[in-house]
């Protein structure tokens, strides 16, 4: 079994009641949530912040298991480009070479109660198209210089859960997708959370669908050079993604 990227277990005797998944768009967050919901007694929650955002909440309870799921940066870029989510219209229509080089902006998508369920109070009269502040730089408030800086900062934020005195496990989407029981084994063996003896595995896609707009298979040498120049390569290596 492949080891997880990281584990934080702060209270050996803790009884867990719930779990929340964090991870960037197109990284398998819905897959991980469905797997845990079907195979553990834990309640899935989203009240401790937007799962695609940087974790920030007054208190993270010890009774919650936080799960962070990551994805290979190249596969993630291709998936995000193929089906962008909450991305400003001017960006989602760009050719790939411009998509990875332009300043990033995300837009607010109204939901009946979704944002409130994430722990936020919002004016629900706001329409689609308002700036999504959770996808701006968390300190400087500016747009990210490009989607690669967005990944660097938000990945660092997700990994910070390992240092926030939380019960947390960080896994790679590739490992869980190849062997779904990988995550369940960690949950059982490390956190002593009961799982089904015979795991219920997912047979179809989970999560909301979105229009597939663009597809890209091969990256140009110039695009790869740009990606390597702007990604935090040390952080990617820590996560098991050498470039």
List each language-model region with its residue ranges.
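Short acidic donor-binding/metal-coordinating loop in glycosyltransferase active sites
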Residues: 173
């Amino acid at each position: 079994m492949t080891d997880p990227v990281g584990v934080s277990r702060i209270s050996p005797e803790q009884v867990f009641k719930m779990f929340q998944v964090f991870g960037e768009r197109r990284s398998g967050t819905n897959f991980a949530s469905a797997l845990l919901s079907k195979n553990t007694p834990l309640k899935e929650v989203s009240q401790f912040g937007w799962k695609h955002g940087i974790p920030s909440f007054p208190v993270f309870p010890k009774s919650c298991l936080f799960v962070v799921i990551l994805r290979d940066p190249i596969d993630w870029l291709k998936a995000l480009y193929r089906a962008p989510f909450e991305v400003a219209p001017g960006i989602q229509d760009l050719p790939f070479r411009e998509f990875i080089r332009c300043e990033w902006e995300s837009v607010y998508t109204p939901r009946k109660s979704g944002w409130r369920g994430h722990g936020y109070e919002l004016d629900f009269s706001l329409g689609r198209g308002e700036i999504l502040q959770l996808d701006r730089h968390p300190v400087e408030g500016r747009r990210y210089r490009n989607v690669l800086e967005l990944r660097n900062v938000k990945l660092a934020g997700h990994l910070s859960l390992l240092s926030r005195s939380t019960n947390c496990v960080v896994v790679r989407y590739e490992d869980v997708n190849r062997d779904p029981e990988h995550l369940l084994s960690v949950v059982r063996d490390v956190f002593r959370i009961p799982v089904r003896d015979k795991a219920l595995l997912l047979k179809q896609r989970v999560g909301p669908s979105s229009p597939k707009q663009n597809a890209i298979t091969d990256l140009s040498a110039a695009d790869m050079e740009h990606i390597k120049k702007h990604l935090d390569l040390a952080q990617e290596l820590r996560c098991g993604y050498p470039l």
